[in-house]
Amino acid sequence: MSHLDNGFRSLTLQRFPATDDVNPLQAWEAADEYLLQQLDDTEIRGPVLILNDAFGALSCALAEHKPYSIGDSYISELATRENLRLNGIDESSVKFLDSTADYPQQPGVVLIKVPKTLALLEQQLRALRKVVTPQTRIIAGAKARDIHTSTLELFEKVLGPTTTTLAWKKARLINCTFNEPPLADAPQTVSWKLEGTDWTIHNHANVFSRTGLDIGARFFMQHLPENLEGEIVDLGCGNGVIGLTLLDKNPQAKVVFVDESPMAVASSRLNVETNMPEALDRCEFMINNALSGVEPFRFNAVLCNPPFHQQHALTDNVAWEMFHHARRCLKINGELYIVANRHLDYFHKLKKIFGNCTTIATNNKFVVLKAVKLGRRR
């Protein structure tokens, strides 16, 4: 846990999933402080919109203004709810919207934590363009190293005149005034042909490797299991290309597409509808934090390309949670398959959790591993 003192309220905040006490990561950053400082003497009129509030620092601080928290992360929503409870704040003080929803009209203040991808930022700025006014105070913040010329140009192109502040505690802010510059329409998704198939893959703005097949998935697809039955999971499904391949290779199986990103799950659904509509009755689509709340001993196999970062921080906490959830939800003799960068050494992590691990394939960058649920373990 970490403490954030600001002009609105003193907060105790924690990350979600929780980090270990040996090497804890903080649940807020200097950019959060810097953004809140700008509102110290501001009379807030109209709705408050907060975009990409990773663990709820801004939403908790501004809870008395009944803000809207907007983003593409179910984990961030869970973190914000947890931190509201931790600080004795009514959860109903914050309204949660995903990035594809309609934003409230004529907001008084918009606070943006700059996301990792310009594509998501552009989608969000285009959505804001439909609702903000010249009187709306628009402020964005991030680590100084994450604000680039391209970031500023995007604000200018979509919303209007843009300036930046000096760095403070290695954070910078962007101030923007809406003046409705001319702007051409943009498609909601980008699409590309998947080589070796007749499939067209469609990706929403926040999907990993949006403009082409990432090399880890490409390697994984060469070593996916075939002729499985029962239910199998594409965990952290992204655009669903692994799940699509599983549907093709396992015609007797049902595939459950799971991701914490609403845009990822929407992309997966769209890609099944576009490329294998006849298989829709063998699909389930789930926005979730890994397999939280899913009954144990349900699945025959889980397949996963786990992330090793959360927002801008490098961490294996999300991967650890995925592995533990997979073990809980697998049937006895059910199998977990993962692809990962070799340097992450997930072999020993899986062996610790499952009691076994087998290397299926390896190259100079990636490894495909399999672990089997052999019986009940603590």
UniProtKB/Swiss-Prot annotation:
GO CC, sorted alphabetically, is: cytoplasm
Q: From the Swiss-Prot or TrEMBL record, state where the protein is found.
A: Cytoplasm
- Chief location: cytoplasm
What InterPro entries is this protein classified in? Answer: DNA_methylase_N6_adenine_CS (IPR002052), rRNA_m2G-MeTrfase_RlmG (IPR017237), RsmC/RlmG (IPR046977), SAM-dependent_MTases_sf (IPR029063), Small_mtfrase_dom (IPR007848)
The reactions it catalyses are: guanosine(1835) in 23S rRNA + S-adenosyl-L-methionine = N(2)-methylguanosine(1835) in 23S rRNA + S-adenosyl-L-homocysteine + H(+)
Among HAMAP family, the record links this protein to: 23SrRNA_methyltr_G (MF_01859)
Kindly provide the name given to this protein in its UniProt entry.
Answer: Ribosomal RNA large subunit methyltransferase G
Species assigned in the record: Escherichia coli O157:H7
Gene symbol here is rlmG
